[in-house]
Design a protein with these regions (language model features):
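Sequence-structural signature of mature extracellular/luminal beta-sheet repeat domains
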Residues: 1-307
Length: 307
């Protein structure tokens, strides 16, 4: 029997969750929780508390919570690269950075064609080690989540591909209003990108688009609308090994099938900004919900590992 924490809208969802399972509230105390990334080697989760300018570590072994970085350059989205290093989107730093194995911070990308990036928002690492990220203006729109500043790129909020070996930074998409969360399909033939442009444009997008990755693995092809958000907006999201999309929304986590059908919801009593799969079997979803960190076990596994 499913608890009231789940809402089944399509019977396929009933197979992706468990009976007698509840959402757990693990910790509270953030102003805007974002950017969860799970480190399987250390069994901990790193996530952002953007307005409080800190990153937080949840230790899965004893459920303790501690400060990881403070100040933290108003970091937003995170990912873990193929070498197990933390990749961070920095609002205040207006860059994508990496924590090296020796603990030092290295800026990987801060400018495009001589102009400062806006405020990198969310990031994913492809299996070839390249780093793909979005660069909307949220971190420079005000002093709340970074330092207010005028965009040097004009109104352009691009999606970028960074080769961390050569440092080459290329625009892979420039037709989003405010690109936000992003994630590849399990075979990396598709890239899903959220657009939260409704925040800046009347009746603007609050949807996810799906974009074909060209055969070169470096550029993007045609795109189409994947799903509109029915409550709030889609911010960050992850895919499971079967290609289902588990995405943040205004009323919790929405699970979408590959055809875009809303299969069901994990209900969270706060706006959710982002999530990631964790746990030793990567079947535990960690959920950043505004003031709190939540988690829930599901009958699905994260597609990318670590992430
Ligand atoms: Mg985001």
């Amino acid at each position: 029997m499913l608890t009231a924490d789940f809402e089944v809208l399509d019977q396929r969802f009933a197979k992706l969750v468990f009976g007698n399972v509840y959402v757990e509230k693990l910790w509270t105390g953030s102003r805007w929780a974002e950017g969860p990334a799970y480190f399987p080697a250390g069994k901990y989760l790193i996530f952002s508390d953007i307005p409080n300018n800190r990153t937080i570590r949840f230790d899965e072994t004893d459920s303790s919570v501690s400060i990881f970085q403070s100040p933290a350059n108003n970091q937003n989205g995170h990912s873990v690269d193929r070498e197990g290093r933390l990749i961070a989107c920095e609002h205040q730093g207006r860059c994508v950075s990496r924590i090296e194995h020796d603990g030092t911070r290295k800026v990987l990308a801060s400018h495009y064609e001589g102009k400062r990036l806006n405020s990198p928002n969310d990031v994913v690492v492809k299996s070839d080690g390249t780093i793909w990220f979005t660069d909307p203006t949220y971190g420079i729109d005000s002093d709340y989540e970074g330092d207010a500043a005028k965009s040097e790129l004009g109104d352009q909020s691009n999606v970028y591909r960074l080769d961390p070996m050569s440092g080459e930074l290329t625009v892979v998409a420039s037709d989003f209003v405010r690109p936000n969360g992003l994630a590849f399909s399990p075979d990396e033939s598709l890239l899903y990108i959220a657009d939260t442009g409704f925040s800046h444009v009347t009746n603007g997008p609050k949807h996810i688009r799906v974009v074909k990755v060209n055969a070169d693995g470096k550029t993007l092809g045609e795109s189409r609308l994947f799903a509109d958000c029915s409550f709030g907006c889609f911010d960050g999201f992850r895919l499971d090994t079967n290609g289902n999309i588990w995405t943040s929304a205004g009323d919790g986590v929405h699970c979408l099938a590959q055809d875009g059908t809303l299969l069901g919801k994990i209900k969270i009593p706060e706006v959710v900004a982002n999530l990631t799969f964790g746990g030793p079997k990567r079947n535990r979803i960690y959920i950043c919900g505004t003031t709190s960190l939540y988690s829930v076990y599901v009958n699905a596994r994260g597609a990318v590992w670590p992430a």
